[in-house]
Amino acid sequence: MLKNTGHEEISLSSLSSSDYSQLEELVNFLIDNFKDKGVNISLPSLRIDAFSLDVMGKVQDIKKSSLTFAPEAGSQRLRDVINKGLTKEVILEGAGMAFEGGWNKVKLYFMLGLPTETEEDMKAIPELANEIAALYYDTVPKEQRNGKCQITISTSFFVPKPFTPFQWATMLDPSDYLARAKIVNDHVKEQLNHKSCLLYTSPSPRD
């Protein structure tokens, strides 16, 4: 299929790719078969605590790209509310592993409008991203850095889904979502410094 389409990337796009017990074996198989063809292996939306440095290193050997992690909430309080099961320490440890593996571009996925979300929770998103950016310079020696660190913050808007703990939660109006995205964007600008590069991308609430 790759030969016929000309595609240059194979993406394991499941939301729980890192929970797959045979992930390392699958990555090894893909690398063995496509490394010489210059085909990139993409592992999006990974759980930081379940990500293997060994797997990262093998993927990095093919082609440098960005990694996507999904903390989903910026504050520990809100991560506990949604039962994410991630502490800031684990997030920073996972990001440090990625930087040690040769990455300098990381995409962080969050949700806005989660039940009980406050302005402090929103501001915690760019603050966490900035801590991760600072970690890059603390973790990787200057002579080993692969360019400037780039952290991309991506948010989507919470939509209640049936048969989930928050199925009866209220969905916000589009104007409320835009107001929350503005809070995040404004606070991102306050985090910028000469070393790190924080980018923020937010979809339209009508997407």
Write out the residue ranges for each language-model feature.
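A structural signal for short, well-ordered beta-strand segments and their strand-loop junctions
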Residues: 152-154, 198-199
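Short, active-site-adjacent cap segments at secondary-structure transitions
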Residues: 19, 160-161
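A short acidic, helix-capping loop that chelates divalent metal ions and anchors anionic groups
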Residues: 77-80, 162-166
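A structural motif corresponding to the C-terminal end of an alpha-helix
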Residues: 97-105, 139, 183-198
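Contiguous mid-protein beta-loop-alpha structural module that forms a pocket-lining wall or clamp
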Residues: 157
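Conserved SAM/AdoMet-binding glycine-rich loop
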Residues: 2-152
